[in-house]
Amino acid sequence: MTKSIYEFWISQGKDKLRLPVLPEQIDISNTIQNESVKVASFGEITFIDKPGAKEISFSSFFPKKHSPLAEYKGFPSPENAIAKIEKWVKSKKPVQFLITGTKINLTCSIEVFSYTEGQKDIGDRDYEIKLKEYKTASPRKIKQKKKTKKKRPSKSAPKTYTVKKGDTLWDLAGKFYGDSTKWRKIWKVNKKAMIKRSKRNIRQPGHWIFPGQKLKIPQ
């Protein structure tokens, strides 16, 4: 015989589980406020408008044999109840959490589920469960602005730099571009002149430059 107007249900599609023993208390929280609600005094639960995802946690037990605390007869064995919840966890799909007599009817993900040997009778299983409201993000339409063709700036004539003692293309790239790894830009436009000045630049590209040598510095 049902002892309370409140029934705790967890389901996934047509697969359902009614919890045999009501928890003494459930904790409901969101990013705006926290509250503890006694099962015996359930009433209308009001949340601040547009709260964050609600989190619900509680603990109870699955009885092995008929218990005076059980809400109904023919409840599943602890092993079957645990197997069902673990199957939902592994599916990585949301479940529906419903408490009759209240406005709690949420699509949730199972964040935590743990169980231990019961403290009351042999074969019972105490458990703790934490659920988090599952919210799907609705797609938003984004208006794309029409791209206007930007006029390409006219290429300016390459700058000329006179090599000083101790200069390297690596250092010059760092000086003009703020990035020494771009030394090949300078090498590319000066390749012929540098090889003509020293054939060693064939084997060691850009390595051989000399004081007084003029190099083009592309923009």
UniProtKB/Swiss-Prot annotation:
PANTHER family: PHAGE-LIKE ELEMENT PBSX PROTEIN XKDP (PTHR34700:SF4), POTASSIUM BINDING PROTEIN KBP (PTHR34700). The gene is yqbP. Residues 139-154 have a biased composition (Basic residues). Gene3D superfamilies: LysM domain. It comes from the Bacteria. Residues 139-160 are annotated as: Disordered. This is Uncharacterized protein YqbP. InterPro entries: Bact_Kbp (IPR052196), LysM_dom (IPR018392), LysM_dom_sf (IPR036779). Residues 159-217 form the LysM domain.
